[in-house]
Amino acid sequence: MISVLAPAKINLFLRVCGKDDRGYHHLDSLIVFTEFGDRLTFEPAADDALIVTGEFSTALDSAEIVTPRFNRQTQDNRGADNLVMRALDGYREAGGVIDGLAITLEKNIPVGAGLGGGSADAAALLRAVNALSRAPLDSSVLYDLAASLGADVPVCLAGGCQRIAGIGDGMTPFTMPQTGAILLANPRIPLSTRDVFTHSDIRYSGVAGSLDGLDAAGLVALGNDLTPAALVLVPQIRSCLEIMEATSGIKCAAMSGSGGSCFALFEQTSDAKAAAAQLEIAGYWAIASQIYQVD
């Protein structure tokens, strides 16, 4: 049995640079990952099976996981389109060799939250099965498979700190300044990425330019062009940010991705934990964590 982390994804800034002829938005964004996330456990099995547990196991829709349990050998195939099992199917179709697996997904990341939960889960699956495989895929093949599963899956597969460009197909590693602790919070209201990107209130700030010399707060200050649209769709995001910004020891706060999760950076973990407690009292989901550093 092996267990792997699927870390939550944070967009420290996100700027919309325009749309291409296909209607895809081109972005400039800096992405990091946290020590908090979902967890996938793998055990050998005669047939593939998926069990979903955790706080948000029942909140998943057809875009990710739609049943608490999925087994290919049963007539209940409502989970056939979930991203974890699609990643496993895609791995085999690409030539990877892996025997049957019983997979347990502990779903800790809120759904529809702008934290990349489904993409992180798919990327964690690909990393794990490639390590277990008798005939692992080359990194380029694995990347192409990740890209076929969704725009955020390649960066979740790469991990670390990455500056992304275009529709997510351009990736450049970036050395993240010291950040201290990070607080994540969510109003417990799912927000559709499609609804945000098609809303008339998104901004088009363009490429941020050089990031040299910017500290963590300076990077966050480059902004999130999706925030105005998300605030219209889920006004509770504003209250979340206001509570964060009023807490002791905060360096900066912003919305992550397409929302509705927000994050804040703190020097001290104790301050982040105190802020999380305040948000929970106000009815928000919240957790204090650290930026995940790649060895």
Predicted segments, located by residue:
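Short, well-ordered alpha-helical segments
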Residues: R78-M85, A123, R238, K273
